[in-house]
């Protein structure tokens, strides 16, 4: 019997520009780049030089602290640049792609005949292991500690997020192979949404399926971990993006690294929002250049509007990116009387505007403005209304700001990731950058416990 967990807290933000279940072609590109910052908590050591020839699956850089964790090139070709920033920080490794792609053959493997160590070794050798994250700290993991459990969330419910069921179509076999491989390492939990009906999800084998019924952020893997089996101090669990599970399955089924994924190009500033097949590291310009309604006063986001990163068309599809979104920047708006003027087209959690009368199906075109400056933190219970976790969000944020490590541990910082506070940041009257604050707290704890 499938376990069903109903979440009463949360908030759905219905934005204009959801991607239709249609595909468009973004074509092949001359250059691709792998960006180390996509793999949080990992310090890269570049293992190629400009002019080197690489195949798909060859390592471009490794984790400096654990060099057996490699990061594979998404394309074959010639390394054209290793771009560095301040203090020689590696920003990206750029590869000029071949017209005909060549692959490293890692050999097909029958997952049923492998044990957990063999699965981990295969992922390490192919440069895919770094796509696995961990709690605590919400960073790219390393193989030196065996996880207590592995969690996969197939529910993407952030505003304008890509529909994983649409991406799963045609990849069911690889997805199941990836799940079976992870189950060899540790007990694996698959979280799905109450509205998801794909048999590859509802009938997934070798894993424990849990249905989450509730508003955003029910799809956050951290929320699911907290509601299924919370993380205690000293424990480690792995969290895996469902697309990465497909990557793993392709490796075992074909013996090759294949980083193709379906990316939603969405937002109110996109003409005919839809999906396109793209590679990790593909230039964002190839996805949006024919889709942008205008080129000025637009905020491009590598990810969704709540947890994604501000980017430009010259940036590249991230390692965990399932959508590229475009919303109004808001820097050309001049509103008479500001928020005081009654209106019907603005979203309000507190029902300050009359837009709530139009029901939950009304779509909004929100821009990137914060609409207010940072101010003193008010203990109002705002966070708890949109945070379906067994933690005291406001008290945890205060402990992080104060740098009180003991208090942070007591309040459950080991269970959270920055994205878990995305909605709290959206509704916060104090205009605090909560995700950034949580990231600072996690980095502080990680350094303290190193």
Regions flagged by a language model, labelled:
Residues 1-47, 62, 212:
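N-terminal, Lys/Arg-enriched amphipathic/low-complexity engagement segments
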Residues 42, 73, 89:
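Exposed loop/turn and edge beta-strand positions of beta-sandwich/beta-sheet ligand-binding modules
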Residues 1-15, 22-23, 80, 85, ...:
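Mobile cofactor-carrier "swinging-arm" domains
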Residues 68-76:
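Short coil-to-beta-strand transition motifs
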Residues 42, 48, 65-68, 272:
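Short, solvent-exposed loop/turn positions at domain surfaces
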Residues 48-62, 81:
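Short, well-structured beta-strand-loop connectors
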Residues 69, 83-286, 290-450:
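Buried, small/hydrophobic-residue-enriched core segments of structured protein domains
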């Amino acid at each position: 019997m499938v376990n069903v967990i109903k979440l009463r807290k949360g908030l759905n933000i219905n934005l204009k520009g959801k991607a239709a279940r249609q595909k468009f072609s973004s074509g092949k590109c001359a250059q691709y780049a792998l960006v180390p910052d996509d793999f949080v908590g990992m310090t890269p050591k570049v293992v190629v030089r400009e002019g080197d020839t690489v195949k798909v699956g060859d390592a471009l850089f490794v984790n400096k602290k654990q060099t057996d964790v490699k990061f594979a090139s998404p394309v074959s070709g010639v390394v054209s640049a290793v771009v560095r920033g301040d203090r020689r920080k590696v920003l990206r490794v750029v590869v000029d792609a071949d017209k005909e792609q060549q692959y490293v053959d890692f050999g097909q493997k029958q997952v049923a005949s492998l044990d957990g160590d063999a699965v981990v070794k295969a992922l390490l050798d192919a440069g895919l292991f770094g796509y696995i994250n961990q709690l605590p700290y919400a960073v790219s993991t390393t193989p030196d500690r065996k996880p207590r459990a592995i969690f996969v969330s197939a529910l993407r419910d952030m505003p304008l997020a890509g529909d994983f069921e649409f991406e799963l179509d045609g990849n069911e076999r690889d997805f199941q192979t990836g799940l079976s491989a992870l189950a060899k390492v540790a007990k694996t939990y698959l979280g799905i949404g109450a509205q998801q009906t794909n048999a590859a999800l509802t009938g997934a084998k070798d894993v424990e399926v849990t249905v989450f019924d509730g508003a955003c952020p029910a799809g956050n893997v951290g929320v699911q971990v907290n509601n299924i089996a919370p993380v205690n101090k000293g424990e480690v669990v792995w969290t895996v993006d469902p697309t990465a599970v497909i990557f793993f399955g392709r490796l075992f089924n074909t013996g090759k690294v294949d980083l193709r994924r379906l990316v939603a190009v969405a937002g109110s500033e996109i003409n005919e929002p839809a999906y396109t097949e793209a590679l990790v590291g593909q230039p964002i310009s190839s996805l949006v250049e024919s889709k942008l309604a205008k080129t000025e006063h637009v905020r491009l986001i590598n990810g969704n509007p709540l947890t994604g990163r501000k980017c430009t068309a010259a940036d590249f599809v991230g390692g965990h990116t399932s959508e590229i979104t475009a919303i109004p920047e808001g820097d050309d708006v001049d509103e008479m009387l500001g928020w005081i003027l009654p209106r019907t087209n603005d979203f309000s959690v507190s029902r300050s505007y009359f837009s709530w009368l139009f029901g939950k199906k009304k779509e909004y075109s929100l821009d990137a403005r914060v609409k207010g400056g940072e101010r003193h933190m008010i203990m109002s219970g705002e966070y708890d209304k949109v945070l379906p976790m067994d933690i005291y969000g406001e008290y945890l944020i205060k402990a992080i700001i104060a740098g009180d490590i003991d208090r942070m541990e007591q309040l459950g910082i080991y269970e959270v990731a920055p994205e878990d506070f995305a909605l709290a940041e959206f509704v916060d009257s104090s205009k605090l950058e909560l995700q950034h604050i949580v990231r600072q707290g996690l980095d502080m704890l990680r350094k303290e416990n190193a």
